[in-house]
């Protein structure tokens, strides 16, 4: 299985408001950058979208180390999702899971891959995290002019 590093970030100007996401894939010395934006979204939706789009860009099953600065995304996958699925996409408090559509899309995007999740503190000087933050901001700038 090919080893791939995936770095993701999402952000919003206003929450909700215009938002963007960025992803950086690195494999075998090659880097690929992805970005996108939406006019009316939330920070968490953009964080999820970055991970989904990064994984969807992989054309074959890979061993992925996915690094995010989003505790929401990392904890959702590593701690909460199993129970959400068992409880028909309800939280422990019996409320519907927010962003269910994107959590389900992320769950599907993960299936072909062997993914290890890593968390990094945002805006802490981590080079790749700073780059995907720049990509998310570029995407927002391009969307809003």
UniProtKB/Swiss-Prot annotation:
**Which one of the record's GO molecular function terms can you name?**
RNA-DNA hybrid ribonuclease activity
Cofactor(s) needed: Mg(2+)
Which keywords annotate this record?
A: Cytoplasm, Endonuclease, Hydrolase, Magnesium, Metal-binding, Nuclease
**Ligand binding (Mg(2+) 2):** 9, 133
Q: Does the keyword Repeat apply?
A: no
Q: How is the cofactor bound?
A: Binds 1 Mg(2+) ion per subunit. May bind a second metal ion at a regulatory site, or after substrate binding.
Protein name as catalogued: Ribonuclease H
């Amino acid at each position: 299985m090919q080893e791939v590093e995936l770095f993701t970030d999402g952000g919003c100007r206003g929450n909700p408001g215009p938002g963007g996401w960025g992803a950086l894939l690195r494999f075998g010395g090659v880097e690929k950058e992805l970005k996108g934006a939406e006019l009316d979204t939330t920070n968490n939706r953009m964080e999820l979208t970055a991970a989904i789009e990064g994984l969807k860009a992989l054309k074959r099953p890979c061993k992925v180390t996915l690094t995010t600065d989003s505790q929401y995304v990392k904890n959702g996958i590593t701690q909460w999702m199993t129970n959400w699925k068992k409880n028909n996409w309800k939280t422990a408090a019996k409320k519907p899971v927010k962003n269910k559509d994107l959590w389900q899309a992320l769950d599907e995007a993960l299936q072909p891959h062997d993914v290890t999740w890593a968390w990094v503190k945002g805006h802490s000087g981590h080079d790749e995290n700073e780059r995907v933050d720049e990509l998310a901001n570029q995407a927002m700038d391009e969307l809003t002019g």
